[in-house]
Amino acid sequence: MSGKPLHEKTKEWARRHVRLLEEVGVTPKLAVLLLNDDPVELETQRRYVSLKARDVREVGGEVEIYELVDVPPERRSKEALYLIERLNRRDDVTGILIQKPVPPFVDEDLLFQRLSPEKDVDALTPENKKRLLALFDLDRDLLPCTPAGILELLQMYGVEVKGRDVTVVGKGELVGKPLAVMLMQLDASVSVLHALTRDKLRYVKEADIVISAVGRPPELYRDNPWRLTGDMVKEGAVVVGVGGKVDPATGKWYFDVDEKSVAEKASYLTPNLGGVGLATRARLLKNLIRASYNVARATAAPRLLKAF
């Protein structure tokens, strides 16, 4: 299940809407905050952000990247809050992304409470999270990028989730938790696995669809490492690999899923490169355009409002 067709289709869609927005003086602009100074996380996040920024610029938007990793830990939350409040007030900034995970000493809940819901392109503010508890619209709502991207990818390849047994490995706020809620809203039977889950292999082996969102490859982590291999899944399973980290010493990527062995068993499999990553980037573009319309509505003509 390549993410390339979805990514290319979304870029064309975004280009059209950038032109419409520019007609009323609004250029989509994404502001990105990097807060995590852990070497593995920082290198991985820089890679992700560079790709996201390239997408935005290619469709005609603009990007500002703020690295606060050199701010002392005791001041980093406060500096991030000041920055978020300034970005909230700026009309030229139409979308804000706090790159996750943030370090444990940063007050993540407070950051997302202060972030403008209208500019929240990862849909992680309390107000935007509420949509997951209702019937969401995958095409029109601001939804978490990776979970929504995964659902769009499954939809594109005709993979039905209704009534299927789905195992989500990882309960993170960015992917695992919101994805599980969204899958349940679509009438899937969902099991969520985490570090304390007993007999993980049983849940994985019985699943029709396995979504691995851990990001703790054995090459980089001694505590609770994870890799999904072909012997762990049943014949014909659909497998979606999300987690991946970069070794800062070598620049090499390591992923949740052993692609070669899983491919021998799976009916559908996302490639480690060019799979969920591209679907996530596609969804970020959609969310940025939606957020840009939120900013434009205060001054936009009725004709523009009908365009989206």
From Swiss-Prot:
Transmembrane segments: none annotated. Pathway: One-carbon metabolism; tetrahydrofolate interconversion. GO terms for biological process: L-histidine biosynthetic process; methionine biosynthetic process; purine nucleotide biosynthetic process; tetrahydrofolate interconversion. The keyword Membrane does not apply. InterPro entries: Aminoacid_DH-like_N_sf (IPR046346), NAD(P)-bd_dom_sf (IPR036291), THF_DH/CycHdrlase (IPR000672), THF_DH/CycHdrlase_cat_dom (IPR020630), THF_DH/CycHdrlase_NAD-bd_dom (IPR020631). The gene is folD. CDD domains: NAD_bind_m-THF_DH_Cyclohyd (cd01080). Gene3D superfamilies: Leucine Dehydrogenase, chain A, domain 1 (3.40.50.10860), NAD(P)-binding Rossmann-like Domain (3.40.50.720). One of its GO terms (cellular component) is cytosol. NADP(+) binds at G170, K171, G172. Catalyzes the oxidation of 5,10-methylenetetrahydrofolate to 5,10-methenyltetrahydrofolate and then the hydrolysis of 5,10-methenyltetrahydrofolate to 10-formyltetrahydrofolate. Keywords: Amino-acid biosynthesis, Histidine biosynthesis, Hydrolase, Methionine biosynthesis, Multifunctional enzyme, NADP, One-carbon metabolism, Oxidoreductase, Purine biosynthesis. Its EC number is 1.5.1.5, 3.5.4.9. This is Bifunctional protein FolD. It comes from the Archaea. It catalyses: (6R)-5,10-methylene-5,6,7,8-tetrahydrofolate + NADP(+) = (6R)-5,10-methenyltetrahydrofolate + NADPH; (6R)-5,10-methenyltetrahydrofolate + H2O = (6R)-10-formyltetrahydrofolate + H(+). It comes from Pyrobaculum calidifontis (strain DSM 21063 / JCM 11548 / VA1). Homodimer. GO terms for molecular function: methenyltetrahydrofolate cyclohydrolase activity; methylenetetrahydrofolate dehydrogenase (NADP+) activity.
